[in-house]
């Protein structure tokens, strides 16, 4: 039995990456859906949700979650979360996507369809407010502030299905490990405490 603490939120890991027949079917369906390009940060966030690294998130945050994280580092359900995980687009694209629609999420740099999402909410945000609350500055020299200020003016929220992890497993081989794989390794070694290091920037 594992001696490790439970995943964030106290439940099981929630990797959103599809596999097998479900993956093949969703890839086929995604090809015909309206497409939204993701920034590098949004693509990274999608990959993290795909492998379960952002457990227990099931998709990009709603307005109430965004507001709660900005103002008190907590989602609407009270779960601690320090930085919003959001998907943005411009006003024109936002107007053309209806709440309830399914969309394909595309890596803006490679054109690869990385996932799909059912849009449950569209909302505008105050970027300066987000920057001040999360980063305590609106200085564009701050990398986090720069990313927020350059994103679209409309956020799209909803549950996602992840179709790809961007080829990282192929590129990095055994160095690429999912949360499930690392937890299995730690358990096999009998570890109960693990020191982790997170770099300042993604």
Predicted regions and their residues:
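Non-catalytic terminal extensions that flank enzyme cores
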Residues: 1-202
């Amino acid at each position: 039995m594992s001696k490790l603490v439970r995943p964030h939120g106290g439940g099981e890991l929630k990797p959103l990456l599809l596999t097998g027949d479900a993956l093949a079917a969703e890839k086929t369906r995604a090809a015909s859906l309206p497409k939204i390009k993701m920034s590098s940060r949004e693509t990274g966030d999608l990959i993290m949700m795909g492998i379960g690294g952002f457990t227990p998130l099931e998709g990009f945050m709603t307005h109430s979650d965004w507001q709660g994280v900005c103002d008190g580092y907590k989602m609407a359900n009270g779960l601690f979360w320090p930085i919003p995980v959001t998907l943005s687009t411009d006003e024109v694209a936002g107007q053309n996507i209806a709440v309830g629609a399914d969309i394909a999420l595309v890596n803006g740099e490679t054109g690869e369809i990385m996932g799909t999402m059912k849009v449950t909410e569209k909302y505008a945000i105050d970027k300066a407010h987000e920057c001040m609350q999360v980063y305590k500055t609106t200085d564009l020299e701050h990398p986090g502030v720069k990313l927020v200020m350059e994103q679209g003016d409309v956020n799209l929220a909803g549950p996602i299905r992840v179709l790809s992890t961007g080829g990282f497993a192929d590129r990095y081989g055994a160095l690429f490990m999912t949360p499930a794989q690392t937890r299995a390794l730690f358990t096999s070694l009998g570890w109960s405490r693990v020191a982790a290091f997170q770099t300042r920037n993604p």
